[in-house]
């Protein structure tokens, strides 16, 4: 996503916002995403195909900016707050509980410098997003972290659920 605001042209900056959505909007969003009928797809790999990890994903918008999900409209409150100039991809990741806080491989989301990545956390648990510089962002319900899409990062799976 390319941001319209002044944050878009700041290099190597990261923005963390707690309580990103108002409580009612947050609850409405999570109810849909966490319901048993929400369609998740198995992916053999997290950072790369067949990297030894797996996750479930839901693609709302593909790499070309095409809407691919009938659930896209549930993202309107998030998109309204983010106010992107353009959307390149929107994907939800669902990871499963592991025995330890397993780290996936470090990766970048794009080589393009102007594109920002936004990670929105639907629940609180002991998983996180870890950056190459050692910075760790804990998974906290209704938190969002916005950073340069070419900044190396990885997911750290949850091992205990604290909801």
Question: Which stretches of residues belong to each language-model region?
Answer:
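Non-heme Fe(II)/2-oxoglutarate
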Residues: 2-86
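A short glycine-rich, His/Asp/Glu-containing loop-to-beta-strand
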Residues: 80, 84-99
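Conserved short histidine dyad/triad with adjacent acidic residue
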Residues: 94-111
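A short beta-strand-loop-beta hairpin characteristic of the jelly-roll/cupin
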Residues: 101-103, 113, 121-140, 156
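Conserved metal-binding segment of the jelly-roll/cupin
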Residues: 137-153
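Conserved small/polar residues in nucleotide/adenosyl-binding loops
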Residues: 161-163
